[in-house]
Amino acid sequence: MRSLYLIVFIVISLVKASKSDDGFCSAPSIVESDEKTNPIYWKATNPTLSPSHLQDLPGFTRSVYKRDHALITPESHVYSPLPDWTNTLGAYLITPATGSHFVMYLAKMKEMSSSGLPPQDIERLIFVVEGAVTLTNTSSSSKKLTVDSYAYLPPNFHHSLDCVESATLVVFERRYEYLGSHTTELIVGSTDKQPLLETPGEVFELRKLLPMSVAYDFNIHTMDFQPGEFLNVKEVHYNQHGLLLLEGQGIYRLGDNWYPVQAGDVIWMAPFVPQWYAALGKTRSRYLLYKDVNRNPL
């Protein structure tokens, strides 16, 4: 009889342990419990810096830099005051030092902050990841940009970005490559207002934030993947890429390397590096992608 009581006690204890968060049968969820209550792109600005089992390794980082690509993860971002901006910290993530012809950086605007102007002949695109800013141009007209909004500023276009509280922007800049008499224009928009474009042979959802006319020498894409979806084409091309993963997680192939990636990660892709992505987890993956277009590579 005592043996029977002992067996029953052990079984009940195991069942309770398996149902508790501390039980040996439990496993952490890959989905945050408050995921649905947080604003869009929250995870990109509040990333998981390292898995719990690696928190005792102070020197651990997922960041990698190679000749033809780089993975720059949030624990590696180094912020300092942005030149010509007020009350703003920036982290330069991709620059010509890597071989790129463009710059990509994060700008963390604090209370009562404002932007500076880029150098002469430099075009700029800003995308709001967190908070809100006000864009003002030379005619004193202003537009409020909130999360998921963006603005393209042509070269030598006088403007100011002002922030009353706080905001996080991802900024792309490059020296404009003039083509005949073609000129670009100020563009203000939001991702949800852009149409879905056809992607023959692919399953992801594609939006382009800039016009596809020859005046524009780069474009910014958003690409959405549901869990389990992946690129069909294993891309190898002359275009350069700068990428910010806004949502989700997955595996990115760069060359012969396969990297686990998550929201908040930045990737630099040089020309002709083999590249491929597959979405994992339980939520949508969305990334923001820079791509040079409409110019002869010669």
From Swiss-Prot:
Q: What's the impact of mutating H237A?
A: Loss of activity
Organism the protein comes from: Arabidopsis thaliana (Mouse-ear cress)
Could you say what the effect of mutating E235A is?
Answer: Loss of manganese binding and loss of activity
MF terms from GO for this chain are:
DNA-binding transcription factor activity; metal ion binding; ureidoglycine aminohydrolase activity
Task: Please name the taxonomic classification of the source.
Answer: Eukaryota, Viridiplantae, Streptophyta, Embryophyta, Tracheophyta
Q: Which family does it belong to?
A: Belongs to the UGHY family.
Its recorded name reads (S)-ureidoglycine aminohydrolase
Entry keywords, A to Z: Endoplasmic reticulum, Hydrolase, Manganese, Metal-binding, Purine metabolism, Signal
Q: What is its main location?
A: endoplasmic reticulum
Query: What is the top-level taxon of the source organism?
Result: Eukaryota
The keyword Ligase is annotated on this UniProt entry: no
Tell me the cofactors it needs.
Mn(2+)
Q: Where is the signal peptide?
A: 1-20
InterPro entries assigned to the protein according to its UniProt record, in alphabetical order: Cupin_2, RmlC-like_jellyroll, RmlC_Cupin_sf, UGHY, UGlyAH_cupin_C, UGlyAH_cupin_N
> Where in the cell does this protein reside?
Endoplasmic reticulum
Report the NCBIfam families cross-referenced here.
Answer: ura-cupin (TIGR03214)
Biological process (GO) annotations?
Answer: allantoin catabolic process; purine nucleobase catabolic process; regulation of DNA-templated transcription; ureide catabolic process
UniProt: Mn(2+) binding residues? E235, H237, H241, Q275
Pfam families according to UniProt: Cupin_2
Known outcome of mutating Y252F: No effect on the affinity for the substrate, but decreased activity
Question: Catalysed reaction per UniProt?
Answer: (S)-2-ureidoglycine + H2O = (S)-ureidoglycolate + NH4(+)
| Keyword Hydrolase among record annotations | yes
Outcome of substituting Q275A: Loss of activity
